[in-house]
């Protein structure tokens, strides 16, 4: 009950309201292709790689419609008739037999694309030239890299350096077995020049203390480690409900397993809980990690992750950020949990052996059996890793995908709700020792499909989404829609032209030119806007509806007095003010303020009598006014008629009485 109260207080400000629809700048589709899925981008080359049912594409990231020879390539995925027939005889769903990509990654210094596809329910590995998409190696079947069933969550990362003998390898968090019943973190046998150097290595899938029905969302190669982000069943509560926690796990690249104990099993595996919660006496937890992106900035590595609550009537989402240094510190020094028949307990520091679980070794075969027995049963750190104050806690939505644009003084987060095809753009920056955020805008994406499959970002230019209908390309900013200098300067991609009073995309040229205004500080309005902000005059007629563009968390005033939502005045979630059925008392000067700074200023003039109409809108407004007057006249006439009838009846009754 207390958690519900916290939930109500925190999320009350985010009541739902329809966001504005935005059209894609460009779209790409192929009538011979089924579902469009994976995205991979090379910003320097301006290349967008797309995986789909039936093919792999290389598109020009600045215009995905351009199919010119120098910027476009297509690799068809083919299944022979005999392979298709054999697959259909065993598959539960014939769509599983269609050739379809599951995983795309760069390798060989971006010169090659590593592809794992499901072809006739077989995982097929290809290495393609990143320019022509021609095969650089013979395709091969390899288990444990990607899943056949697209409904299974998995993750994989190609690691080119730091492995034993510096052999390139893939690390995966995956489900194997006929029904996907085996959950494991896996590295296939290490080979070089066709020779096997080391056997495969994995977690123990038969022991759920290692992984308990995990749902993997991301994996990253960082230094001497590979990190895996996932959610898993932590325990069952007293009501028999399965409690889910989000985790980060870490393994060492040099790990080759133990000599006797933990043979071909990770000796360095260790994990901890990710804590994304609203602080309170009874914290409100977002326990289901949905997506994660890595950001390297100012010598530190950050992981931005989206989280949601369980799928209940009160589903909600938030974004949390985790620092690599904090993750490593906890995994390196935190107390470890031991699970017994009576529950889980933290072991004391002096019980932890000299070779601590999670420590990297140049030769894991040299670790003692005693230390490995301890590592085998002490996998979880007792404390959790804090994600700080949740960014944009929001109810009734699930943030399924995230991309992050790194700008000089801030990071811009794009969070997506796949099912509702909606995106939130958020500014996130550090001020002193405190991280702050500001919602810039929320938009609905107009795409011809029911959900988003994947997202990618071309920094400071476009974001891309895949769906069943194709690939859609959207600009990171809609500057021309900003009505004022203040709102324009809050968007880090925009700049205000003081001469033309228009908002345009910021460029290197206009950013420092005379007459152009943009904020140099994250989340702050440019002080120059106060000198150029103009009063907008809007003429309306009795009965009209009116919409004034405002800003998120803005406060509306009319002639210096606060405007509250009511029967005819509605302040939307995006900060817009909607006036319904305009009356004479609605005339005045309206201001939208935030932190006592005027963002929008407009004077509304309400005309009592219609002037001669000069447009269809004015004609309709006058028509409404005359209709109202006609209705009032009819009502008065009916009252007079009823009264007259009563008078006549009264006189007749009086005459008969005499």
From Swiss-Prot:
Q: Which residues form the Ig-like domain?
A: 556-592
Disulfide bond positions:
87-97, 252-360, 276-320, 479-494, 488-503
One GO term (biological process) = semaphorin-plexin signaling pathway
Its subcellular locations are:
Secreted
Glycosylated residues in this chain: 65, 153, 275, 653
**Gene deleted: what happens?**
Worms have defects both in early embryonic morphogenesis and in postembryonic male tail morphogenesis.
Q: Residues in domain PSI?
A: 478-527
Listed GO CC annotations: cell surface; extracellular region; plasma membrane
Q: Is Signal tagged as a keyword?
A: yes
Q: What is the effect of changing residue 247 to H?
A: In ns789; impairs nerve ring assembly due to non-commissural interneurons AIY failing to extend dorsally and enter the nerve ring. This phenotype is enhanced in a chin-1 ns399 mutant background
Signal sequence extent: 1-19
Task: Indicate the segments forming the Sema domain, all copies.
Answer: 20-476
List the keywords (alphabetical): Developmental protein, Disulfide bond, Glycoprotein, Immunoglobulin domain, Secreted, Signal
- Respond yes or no to whether keyword Signal is given for this record: yes
Q: Supply the InterPro entries for this chain.
A: Ig-like_dom_sf, Ig-like_fold, Semap_dom, Semap_dom_sf, Semaphorin, WD40/YVTN_repeat-like_dom_sf
Q: Which SUPFAM superfamilies does UniProt cross-reference here?
A: Immunoglobulin, Sema domain
Instruction: Provide an example Pfam family for this protein.
Output: Sema
Tissue distribution is: Ubiquitously expressed.
Q: Give this protein's Gene Ontology molecular function annotations.
A: chemorepellent activity; semaphorin receptor binding
Chief subcellular location equals: secreted
- Sequence similarity: Belongs to the semaphorin family.
Q: What does this protein do?
A: Regulates the formation or stabilization of cell-cell contacts at several stages of epithelial morphogenesis. In early embryonic development, required for proper ventral closure of the epidermis. During male tail morphogenesis, regulates precursor cell sorting and allows the formation of distinct sensory rays. Seems to control cell-cell contact formation through 2 parallel pathways, one involving efn-4 and one involving plx-2 and unc-129. Involved in follower axon guidance.
How does the annotation summarize its subunit structure? Interacts with plx-2.
Q: Sorted alphabetically, which PANTHER family does this protein's record hold?
A: SEMAPHORIN, SEMAPHORIN-2A
The entry's protein name is Semaphorin-2A
